[in-house]
């Protein structure tokens, strides 16, 4: 019977061959554990950029204080086996918890998302895109609009590269989108923009 003491972790009564396998088993468990916990960190291979830099302020044009259209996004590093893109834009600093500003899917693996995508369920021009309902209760993009005096909010423009297209109807919720995406994300990248209303 093997005995493991808390202080020394000395194994008593374990054959030498078994002892030699212990480091390998432990290393395997650590790697598997990192895979479960880390999730998509190893997939964060896309570079996402726009007219503002990472952790820089978003121009008012793309907010509720401006024209309120989506900013252009440039995507670099897409693999050849990507079948479609998903975009999720959210604000984790919202008073009631993470607030979703835009969800879109079945975007072809293009390197640029133009600004001003029409706010309707399915769009064919300037690119094909299907859009869902944001937390304003509207379809399409609605930009930053934090409460006045609430400080600087961080807006995460997340791009997911999938190995498939999704069988999801226009107007779907973020929860439905995320469920449909499960097991299909092969690359990921994000851009963080800032905004504040004083």
UniProtKB/Swiss-Prot annotation:
<comment type="similarity">
    <text>Belongs to the UPF0098 family.</text>
</comment>
<protein>
    <recommendedName>
        <fullName>UPF0098 protein PH1269</fullName>
    </recommendedName>
</protein>
<dbReference type="InterPro" id="IPR005247">
    <property type="entry name" value="YbhB_YbcL/LppC-like"/>
</dbReference>
<dbReference type="InterPro" id="IPR036610">
    <property type="entry name" value="PEBP-like_sf"/>
</dbReference>
<dbReference type="Pfam" id="PF01161">
    <property type="entry name" value="PBP"/>
</dbReference>
<dbReference type="InterPro" id="IPR008914">
    <property type="entry name" value="PEBP"/>
</dbReference>
